[in-house]
Amino acid sequence: DPVEGSTLASTAMIQHEIDVPLHVLARKIGAEKAARAWRRSARAVEDLRLRVERLGINCAMTAKQALYLAGNEYGSRALQTEAQTRHEAGIAADYLNAAALQDRFGLSRTGAIVSDFSASANPAQMTAGLLRAAMARGAELVSPVEVTDVEERGETVILATSEGRLLTAGHVVFCTGYEFLKVMESPVHRIISTWALASRPDMARPGWLDGFLVWEASDPYLYFRTASGGRTVSYTHLTLPTKRI
């Protein structure tokens, strides 16, 4: 159903930084394609923020910086390489060594990257606002509908529902969050656990945290940010790789 499920569980950390570091992605698909993907991601965050502002959606949308901490997946040397690769691609990123990180943020890691182009929002309010705007422009919202199977036939996508109906479309976009359809499961990875947590209101926290999204180069990993009412919202996720790509 709209504005339920994984929407309500979302931490709404809207990051331009995609899961694969730029210097790693460049080795996989080439420097030019990788840089383009990262630049488009940064532009997408800014476009979303401006769209929410233009539509007048009240969802606590706020521009944020991101603090990416060294971890067990990528250490200080990898983060130095990553920051340099981003600079070369025209994406601003500042590398902090352990001493600078401790001095500025009071955190003990071997290194970190500070970057712009991220944001946070209330996910339920933002989703509801965007859906209302879409419907005002002629989109149709149908709920509840359970899609049980998907099949591609030429230029057409066919969806089967639990009621026995078949829906056809030229394109289908799945925005299911953590709820995977069986036909979308991948041999590349398997989710072991994922948790979203929120603290009590007015939790004691450093002042700088209100302006940052914090995440780490680890597996399992932890992300966290502040939310309205003085809460701290966090997200932890563990995947089990089954096949390297």
Please provide the spans of the model-predicted regions.
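Glycine-rich FAD pyrophosphate-binding loop
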Residues: 1-9
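Dinucleotide-binding Rossmann-like beta1-alpha1 core, especially the glycine-rich loop
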Residues: 14-98
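Flavin-dependent oxidoreductases
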Residues: 149-227
